[in-house]
């Protein structure tokens, strides 16, 4: 990256900036694992924002209810008899819950920070002893955790005065992780250059807590609202969990030529949410959840707990679902029973469906849509041991027959290999197989199963 860029980075207020909870007045020093929310926290702007968001949903629900009432005066759930009809009125949607009853389960990293085990500090190369100790410790972590990155390159950027580092520090300035970034405040974004946690410290949730500290610090000290970073295949999952996406909405003219480009990396962007303090996100979500549950309980009977059924006291027995107390009231119907019997899709179904759809829609897929006809090619099934085509793959996919991603990839390879085995290399079929396989492997490398690609 050229050193002649016009953008100047904003230096931190001091050589080593303490980013612990003492700099965030809304952060509590309570070390209780399940922390109840205090009544006076309703004055917290983030709490008010959470309730306001919930109230906004309430207003929408009330509006929808009025629209519904104009055509029908009653709200009737599926499977509920006329005697169970209930009019949905706006007063049913009022927020009515004790905010002090909301409990937030805090992660180990948060508890360690509150108890003083770890601290979060923003460090720059200002030639002071403490800064150099922390930057050197962070450099050693990056060198170990990022073995493919040249050591000289890491060293140059860590000590570069245009870069800042958010570090996790234990006793005696012992660094256990951090993020090195370069702010481009005039352009409205910051580039995350390196991000790593020491291998023996990666089970305490440090990574997420570190990113939350970085977001709050950057937004609190600059006008920056966006992050850009290049992530390798192993880091994409982490960045997705932190709100990053592969969809880049920033105009290229803003960042091209300013950030470092890495071969084989995936460019990702994170746009911070206005008015959200990321270190208090768990509190905001807990309050919103409590508000939603409160509203649900006012218009449904989902919170009612019925006693056990006497019919099972004498051993196994059969009972119609309609005879189970409360089931009809929540909208049970026969169709639900049939749906529950259908096999559930595997966790990787969405990925396989995407890969199949991409293959099916590719211009080179036409020869492989249906099984090879025995009438047109009599000896095909004598030569080919494992015949395969896209219609067979689709049948297996729709019927949940793939037990693993590897099985799906194996069937796709059968299509390509069978075609090349039976046809000459100068034929259209052979060339289509090559093109489709190349496209398939490219799409596979874009998923979390990229390690299975050739």
From Swiss-Prot:
Give me the stretches of Basic and acidic residues compositional bias. 31-41
Q: Which residues form the active site?
A: 191
Pfam family example for this protein? Acetyltransf_1
Q: Does the keyword Transcription apply?
A: yes
Which molecular-function annotation in GO is an example for this chain? histone H3K9 acetyltransferase activity
Query: Bias category Low complexity: which stretches?
Result: 11-22
GO CC list? chromatin; histone acetyltransferase complex; nucleus; pericentric heterochromatin; SAGA complex
Broadest EC class assigned to this enzyme: transferase
Catalytic activity reads: L-lysyl-[protein] + acetyl-CoA = N(6)-acetyl-L-lysyl-[protein] + CoA + H(+); (2E)-butenoyl-CoA + L-lysyl-[protein] = N(6)-(2E)-butenoyl-L-lysyl-[protein] + CoA + H(+)
GO process terms (BP): chromatin remodeling; negative regulation of induction of conjugation with cellular fusion; positive regulation of transcription by RNA polymerase II; regulation of transcription by RNA polymerase II; transcription initiation-coupled chromatin remodeling
Q: Where does acetyl-CoA bind?
A: 195-197, 202-208, 234-237
Which parts of the chain span the membrane according to its record?
A: none
Keywords assigned: Activator, Acyltransferase, Bromodomain, Chromatin regulator, Cytoplasm, Nucleus, Transcription, Transcription regulation, Transferase
List localization entries: Nucleus; Cytoplasm
User: Where is the stretch described as Disordered?
Assistant: 1-83
Main location, first listed in the record: nucleus
Write the Enzyme Commission number(s) for this entry: 2.3.1.48, 2.3.1.-
Q: Where is this site: Important for catalytic activity?
A: 191
Bias (Polar residues) ranges: 70-82
Q: Which residues form the Bromo domain?
A: 339-447
Domain N-acetyltransferase intervals = 118-273
Domain comment from the record reads as follows: The bromodomain mediates acetyl-lysine binding in histones.
Q: What does this protein do?
A: Histone acetyltransferase that acetylates histone H2B to form H2BK11ac and H2BK16ac, histone H3 to form H3K9ac, H3K14ac, H3K18ac, H3K23ac, H3K27ac and H3K36ac, with a lower preference histone H4 to form H4K8ac and H4K16ac, and contributes to H2A.Z acetylation. Acetylation of histones gives a specific tag for epigenetic transcription activation and elongation. Operates in concert with certain DNA-binding transcriptional activators such as GCN4 or HAP2/3/4. Its acetyltransferase activity seems to be dependent on the association in different multisubunit complexes.
What is the similarity comment for this entry? Answer: Belongs to the acetyltransferase family. GCN5 subfamily.
On assembly, the entry states: Component of the 1.8 MDa SAGA (Spt-Ada-Gcn5 acetyltransferase) complex, which is composed of 19 subunits tra1, spt7, taf5, ngg1/ada3, sgf73, spt20, spt8, taf12, taf6, hfi1/ada1, ubp8, gcn5, ada2, spt3, sgf29, taf10, taf9, sgf11 and sus1.
Name this polypeptide is given: Histone acetyltransferase gcn5
> Which gene is annotated as encoding this protein in its UniProt record?
gcn5
């Amino acid at each position: 990256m050229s050193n002649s860029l016009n953008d100047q980075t904003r230096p931190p207020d001091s050589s080593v900036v303490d980013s612990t909870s003492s700099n965030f007045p809304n952060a509590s020093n309570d070390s209780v694992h399940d922390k109840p929310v205090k009544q006076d926290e309703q004055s917290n702007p983030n709490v008010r924002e959470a309730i306001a968001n919930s109230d906004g949903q309430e207003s929408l629900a009330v509006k929808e209810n009025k629209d519904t009432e104009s055509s029908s005066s009653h709200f009737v759930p599926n499977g509920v008899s006329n005697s169970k009809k209930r009019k949905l009125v706006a007063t049913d949607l009022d927020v009515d819950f004790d905010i002090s009853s909301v409990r937030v389960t805090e992660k180990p990293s948060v508890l360690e920070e509150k108890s003083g085990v770890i601290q979060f500090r923003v460090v720059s190369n200002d030639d002071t002893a403490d800064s150099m100790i922390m930057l050197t410790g962070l450099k050693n972590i990056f060198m170990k955790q990022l073995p493919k990155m040249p050591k000289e390159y890491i060293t140059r950027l860590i000590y570069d005065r245009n870069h800042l580092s958010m570090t996790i520090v234990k006793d005696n300035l012992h660094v256990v992780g951090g993020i090195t970034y370069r702010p481009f405040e005039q352009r409205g974004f910051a580039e995350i250059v390196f991000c790593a946690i020491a291998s023996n410290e990666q089970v305490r949730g440090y990574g997420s807590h570190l990113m939350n500290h970085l977001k709050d610090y950057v937004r609190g000290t600059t006008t920056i609202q966006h992050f850009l970073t290049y992530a390798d295949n192993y880091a994409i999952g982490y960045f997705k969990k932190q709100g990053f996406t592969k969809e880049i909405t920033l105009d290229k003219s803003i960042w091209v030529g300013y950030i470092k480009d890495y071969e084989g990396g995936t460019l990702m962007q994170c746009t911070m949410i206005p008015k959200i303090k990321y270190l208090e996100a768990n509190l905001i979500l807990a309050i919103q959840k409590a508000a939603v549950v409160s509203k649900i309980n006012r218009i449904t009977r989902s919170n009612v707990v019925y006693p056990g059924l006497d019919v099972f006291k004498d051993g196994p027995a059969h009972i119609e679902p309609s005879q189970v107390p409360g089931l009809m009231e929540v909208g049970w119907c026969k169709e639900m029973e049939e749906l529950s019997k259908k096999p559930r899709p595997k966790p990787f179904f969405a990925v396989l469906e995407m890969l199949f759809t991409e293959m099916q829609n590719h211009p080179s897929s036409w020869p492989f849509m249906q099984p090879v006809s025995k009438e047109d090619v009599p000896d095909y099934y004598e030569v080919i041991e494992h015949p395969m085509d896209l219609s067979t793959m689709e049948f297996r996919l729709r019927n949940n027959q793939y037990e693993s991603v590897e099985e799906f990839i194996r069937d796709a390879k059968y299509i390509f290999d069978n075609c090349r085995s039976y046809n000459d290399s100068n034929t259209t079929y052979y060339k289509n197989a090559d093109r489709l396989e190349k496209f398939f492997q490219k799409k596979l490398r874009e998923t979390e199963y990229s390690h299975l690609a050739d």
